[in-house]
Curated annotation (Swiss-Prot):
Major place of residence: membrane
Species this chain originates from: Francisella tularensis subsp. tularensis (strain SCHU S4 / Schu 4)
Membrane topology of the entry: Single-pass type II membrane protein
Subunit structure as annotated in this protein's UniProt entry: Part of a complex composed of FtsB, FtsL and FtsQ.
Protein name as annotated: Cell division protein FtsL
Stretches in topological domain Periplasmic: 46-116
Gene Ontology CC: cell division site; plasma membrane
Residues in the Cytoplasmic compartment per record: 1-24
One GO-annotated biological process of the protein: FtsZ-dependent cytokinesis
Keywords: Cell cycle, Cell division, Cell inner membrane, Cell membrane, Membrane, Transmembrane, Transmembrane helix
Family according to the record: Belongs to the FtsL family.
Length: 116
């Protein structure tokens, strides 16, 4: 018995339709769909991981740079507080040590102001 092209197409379509609604084929398609979702999720997660890793590296570099700046600032302040630096500043501003006559106590000054 010879089948026509139309009959072959109809039987093939019915065969696909019947097999598609079977449990095994439905489960296979569901698993394929889950597999594709998982693969795309993995791609997204790895991309986000690389972005976060790059951000972490940038933050570590910035932390190192800020630590170096902090060390420089601490060194500058400590060098400004040395006795020689203070003495040079005092000479530049023409400062002198106070004499006994120029030293006054705050309590005495308040009393003088109150008496006036």
């Amino acid at each position: 018995m010879m089948l026509t092209n139309r009959q072959i197409r109809v039987r093939l379509f019915e065969s696909l339709k019947n097999s598609f609604f079977k449990k095994t084929v439905g489960i296979s398609f569901a698993l394929l769909f889950i597999l594709l979702i998982t693969a795309f999720s993995l791609i997204v997660v790895r991309f986000e991981y690389k972005l976060q890793l790059n951000e972490q590296k940038n933050l570590i570099l910035e932390d190192t740079r800020l630590d170096e700046q902090w060390s420089q600032i601490v060194l500058e302040y400590s060098s400004l507080a040395t006795p020689t630096a203070v003495e040079k500043f005092a000479q530049k501003e023409k400062m002198t040590l106070p004499t006994r006559k120029t030293i006054g106590f705050l309590n005495e000054q308040k009393e003088e102001l109150n008496n006036e």
